Amino acid sequence: LLEHTKKIEAVEEVPLLEALGRILAEDAVATFDNPPFDRSPLDGYAFAASGTKGAQKEAPASFRIIGEECAGDFFAQEVPEGAAVRLMTGAAIPKGCDCVVRQEDVTVQDECILVPYELHHHENYCFAGEDVRKGTLAVKRGTELTAAHLGVLASLGLGTVKVRRRPRIAIASTGDELVLPGEPLRPGKIYNSNLYVLAGRLRELGFGPEVLGILPDDAAKAASFIAGWREKVDLFLTTGGVSVGKKDIMHEVVRRIGTRLFWRVCIKPGAPVIAYTAGDMLGIALSGNPFASYATFELLTRPVLAALAGRSDVAYRAAEGFLADAFPKPSYGRRFIRAHYADGIFSIPAQHDSGSLFSAAGCNALIDIPAGTEPLVAGTRVKGVLL
């Protein structure tokens, strides 16, 4: 799948506040020292430290106050020996000063401050470039931008940034038996839960899919509909129609519109998956069984999404731990079962049939059971994938 996934190269420039969760398209390099000047880390007074030599409580050093500077101000003149400037936190340290004393440590008397102890060169002193030096790579190309990254980019003075275009994704379900929530449930029908699970999961992962509803069990109509999206989306996801039944239409759909990459994968649940290409569009047709479609979405589609978006790491988040519960079935093929993972313990719900979705609520992991594994007893050490 990843070999046929074309990373999106298109770049767009967006306002910084709209870049959260986006993939940075070019390195962000500091063009100036940050902070751009020496500054005070506290409210106090700046002066030359040499003037405090020998100062003590009984014989404090005296400095004449010649000005005041808040953050954002700039004291232009050089401060002579024996003089001090009052500074607020973040204010630039004036020329001629090499230390700052806390304002609560001094006594103000007759427009002078009395300093009761010696200070050293660069005491209470923040240097220009202490956070980031000019020329430093601040945020690397390919980084998924978090709130902290936005703060770094803002500190570089960037109001806009270049990011990868978001993957364009469409999602639909197949099946004449499906109705949308909110509609009357007629005899023989079921509500379409798959569409909502996968659309919601896509949004949780930061992707905004086009949710296209339900396609009929008619290969010609479904093929025509999906083909109409070939130039509009990078990835088309469907659920249902992938097994060998009379109305499993996705085989014929793929023959009509594109090239099949594979059908079936050696895992349970969700083995009957079809992957295909149609022009530049990649298609993944997942099982119609609710948990099977959810599991194969996580295992197969999620890495594709990461690759499309240009993320540098598409690996699963792996975990190891111990079973809190027994799993009574042998696994002749590789099997993934839902679980809740916390503090190194995997807890398995009582219901784990591929057609059941209810027990998936509250689960945050899939346990990976190798092929040829006998039933598992509680306490067995296992590996899993975190969702």
Question: Can you describe what each PLM-predicted range is?
Answer:
Residues L2-E9, D27, I93, T136-T143, ...:
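Structural signal for hydrophobic packing residues in well-ordered secondary-structure cores
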Residues V11-E18, L42, P60, V101, ...:
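Conserved active-site and cofactor/substrate-binding residues in soluble primary-metabolism enzymes
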Residues G159-L286, P290-T296:
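Helix-rich terminal scaffold detector
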